[in-house]
Every structure is written in C-alpha cells, then in structure tokens.
C-alpha cells in the first residue's frame, strides 16, 4: 500500500502552460507546497531555465538561487521548485529586472517585464472575509495571505493593492460593473475587459459578462474573474496584446501587415 506524498511528476502529466517539450526528459519539476495550486503555478526553475534562459539545467538554477539573487514578492527564495503564480512579482537583484506573472491571451504565463516602481506592489483577490479569535476581523487572499484588521468596506471578490515592502493594504477596488478585469480560468483565460453585467443563479454559478477593448462580449464564471482596475484604467501594466483575443484570420492579417511594413 502506497503511503505519503507524491514526490515526482512525469513530464507528460505536467501542466500544458509550462510549455515543456516531451522529449527532453522523463520527469518535470514537482512544485513545492506553497501559495499557489500545483496546476496553476509556475515553478521558479521553469521560469529561470525555460523562459528567461538564465540557466541551461537544474544545477545552474540552484547555483543562482543559492546566491540569494532571486526574490518573489520581495522575499528571497532558494527553493528551485517554489510555486510562483498569478500576480507574483519576481525580481532579479543582479540585473535589476522585475517581472510580473500574468497570463497571455492563450492562458499561459508570459514573461512580462515591469518597472522598479511597479514592482513595489501587487494586486490580490479577496477570497474570504471573516472574524477570527477574540473578534479580530481578517481577510484571506488568492495567494494565501491572511491580513488582519482590513478596511470594513472590503468584501469577497474585491481586489486589494498590497505594498510588498510593508505588507499593508494601500487601496482596494470594488467588484462592480464597469470595473476592469482579467480572466484567470476557463476558455477565455488571459482576456481583459470591463464588467457589463452580473447574472445571479441561486444554487449555481454566477455568470459575469465582460466586454473587451474591441467591444466583443463574452461570459465566464465569477470565480474566473480578477479585478485589475477601475473604469478604463488598469492598476498594472498589461502584456503584449493588452488582453484582446483576435480570431485566427485577424492574427493572420496582422502578421501579413507587419511583413509588408518590414
């Protein structure tokens, strides 16, 4: 009888959005327990080796991490399989580079560079608000943080702006119509738009209708929506494409136009 946790992950069973090829080994990095789910995270080794190409293999990644050069959300991380996830800020001390993990329109984590000023904060979705021991109010965010004594106006599904140096809430955005959102799950993953309408379904999933920059409307579940800004203004910089999903023919026409200019 098998006992204990699984310590290995076969390469073919790894999440598709890691973009690992099947023929370069039998195994993939098994994410450590941490703030993000195994299927929704990107281990540090995959980010440094496969995306940034700062290392050729796992041994080189460990050598980089053991020099304490890599910070995630302002904290030094030395675990090569540490699970980084949506909205995390990864800083490389030696090069002065900062990255925010956000999705592209195909639902994959993209290498999105940000300024040092923007790297000082991150956005967190509020998953739970309740009273703790001795009546102390607290909230829990999407990345597992517990913050005591929040603003009483902050409710579930709102987004807080968290200062990574002080770990204090600087501001928050209400989950409401006309708020700007990014979709973090489902077939519309990575798309950005404005909330148009909210459908309530008792005993079932609430449906959110979103309109993107090209006035195309789509719908997704409430749990898949992450508020990133107020009306017409995002609180974070967006990756290439600005979260607008194009059809295959539109992508083809854009490529042809760029070739014609070249």
From Swiss-Prot:
Q: Tell me the Gene Ontology biological-process terms attached to this UniProt entry.
A: cytoplasmic translation; translation
Q: What is this protein called?
A: Small ribosomal subunit protein eS4A
Q: Which PANTHER family match?
A: 30S/40S RIBOSOMAL PROTEIN S4, SMALL RIBOSOMAL SUBUNIT PROTEIN ES4
Query: What is the stated purpose of this protein?
Result: Component of the ribosome, a large ribonucleoprotein complex responsible for the synthesis of proteins in the cell. The small ribosomal subunit (SSU) binds messenger RNAs (mRNAs) and translates the encoded message by selecting cognate aminoacyl-transfer RNA (tRNA) molecules. The large subunit (LSU) contains the ribosomal catalytic site termed the peptidyl transferase center (PTC), which catalyzes the formation of peptide bonds, thereby polymerizing the amino acids delivered by tRNAs into a polypeptide chain.
Q: Which UniProt keywords apply?
A: Cytoplasm, Ribonucleoprotein, Ribosomal protein, RNA-binding, rRNA-binding
- Its Gene Ontology molecular function terms? RNA binding; rRNA binding; structural constituent of ribosome
Self-association state and partner proteins as the record states: Component of the small ribosomal subunit (SSU). Mature yeast ribosomes consist of a small (40S) and a large (60S) subunit. The 40S small subunit contains 1 molecule of ribosomal RNA (18S rRNA) and at least 33 different proteins. The large 60S subunit contains 3 rRNA molecules (25S, 5.8S and 5S rRNA) and at least 46 different proteins.
Q: Which gene encodes it?
A: rps401
Q: Which family does it belong to?
A: Belongs to the eukaryotic ribosomal protein eS4 family.
Which HAMAP family does this entry report, sorted A to Z?
Ribosomal_eS4
Tell me if Cell inner membrane is a UniProt keyword of this record: no
Q: Name one GO cellular component term.
A: cytosolic small ribosomal subunit
| Gene3D superfamilies xrefs | 2.30.30.30, 2.40.50.740, RNA-binding S4 domain
Compartments annotated for it: namely:
Cytoplasm
Q: Does the keyword Transmembrane apply?
A: no
A Pfam family of this chain: Ribosomal_S4e
């Amino acid at each position: 009888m098998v006992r204990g946790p699984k310590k290995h992950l076969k390469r073919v069973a790894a999440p598709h959005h890691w973009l690992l090829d099947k023929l370069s080994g039998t195994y993939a990095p098994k994410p450590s327990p941490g703030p993000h789910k195994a299927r929704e995270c990107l281990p540090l080794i995959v980010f440094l080796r496969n995306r940034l190409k700062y290392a050729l293999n796992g041994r080189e990644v460990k050598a980089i991490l053991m020099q304490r050069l890599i910070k995630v959300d302002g904290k030094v991380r030395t675990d090569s399989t540490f699970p980084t996830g949506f909205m995390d800020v990864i800083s490389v001390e030696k090069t002065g580079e900062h990255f925010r993990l956000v999705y592209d329109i195909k639902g994959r984590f993209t290498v999105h560079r940000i300024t040092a000023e923007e790297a000082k904060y991150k956005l967190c979705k509020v998953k739970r608000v309740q009273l703790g021991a001795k009546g102390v109010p607290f909230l829990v965010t999407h990345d597992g943080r517990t913050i005591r004594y929040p603003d009483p106006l902050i409710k579930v599904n709102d987004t807080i702006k968290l200062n990574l140096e002080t770990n204090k809430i600087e501001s928050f955005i209400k989950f409401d119509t006309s708020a700007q959102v990014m979709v973090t799950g489902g077939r519309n993953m990575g798309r950005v738009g404005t909330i148009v309408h909210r459908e309530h379904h008792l005993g079932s999933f609430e449906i959110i209708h979103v309109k993107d920059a090209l006035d195309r409307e789509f719908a997704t579940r409430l749990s898949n929506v992450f508020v990133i800004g107020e009306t017409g203004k995002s609180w974070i910089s967006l990756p290439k494409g600005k979260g607008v999903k194009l059809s295959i023919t539109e992508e083809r026409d854009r490529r042809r136009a760029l070739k014609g200019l070249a």
